[in-house]
Design a protein with these regions (language model features):
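Surface-exposed, low-hydrophobicity beta-strand/loop segments enriched in small/polar/acidic residues
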Residues: 1-127
Length: 127
C-alpha cells in the first residue's frame, strides 16, 4: 500500500458468526443473529471490511466502516474503479444494479491481490 496511509478510519467491534480467521480484508455484513459474516451475494449491501482474524463464533471482529482499507480483490480492476462485493466477499468492479462500496486507489492485477480502497459503503448503485 505504498503512498497511502490509513487516516481517520472508523472501526467497530461486532461478534463473529464463526471462524473468520481466513477472511481478513473481505467485505462483511451483519446476519440475523447480530453477528458479522462474509457477504456472499454479489453486489449486495455490506456493513464494512473485516480487519482482523477472529477464530471462533462470538469473538470480537474489527470491522472498518470508513477510511482507507485493504481489500482482497476477486478479479483484476483498474485504479479508480468503483468496486462492490463478489460471491466470496472480495472486491470486484461494480456493474449495473450493484451497490458501490468504494474506489480503488491502486489497481488489482489479479484475483487475491490486496489493494487499497477508499471506502464509500453502499454509496449508490451503478446505473
Amino acid at each position: 500500500m505504498s503512498g497511502f496511509t490509513h487516516t481517520a478510519p472508523e472501526c467497530i467491534s461486532i461478534e463473529a458468526s464463526g471462524d473468520l480467521s481466513t477472511k481478513q480484508y473481505l467485505f462483511v455484513d451483519v446476519n440475523s443473529d447480530g453477528q458479522v459474516a462474509v457477504e456472499t451475494s454479489a453486489g449486495a449491501a455490506v456493513v464494512g471490511v473485516l480487519q482482523d482474524k477472529p477464530s471462533a463464533q462470538g469473538r470480537p471482529a474489527c470491522v472498518m466502516l470508513s477510511g482507507v482499507s485493504q481489500v482482497v480483490a476477486g478479479a483484476a480492476f483498474d485504479a479508480g474503479a468503483r468496486v462492490t462485493v463478489d460471491t466470496a466477499g472480495k472486491a470486484q468492479e461494480a456493474t449495473s444494479g450493484q451497490y458501490i462500496h468504494g474506489t480503488a486507489l491502486k489497481a488489482a492485477t489479479a484475483a487475491d491481490d490486496r489493494v487499497a480502497i477508499l471506502l464509500q459503503l453502499n454509496s449508490g448503485q451503478v446505473a
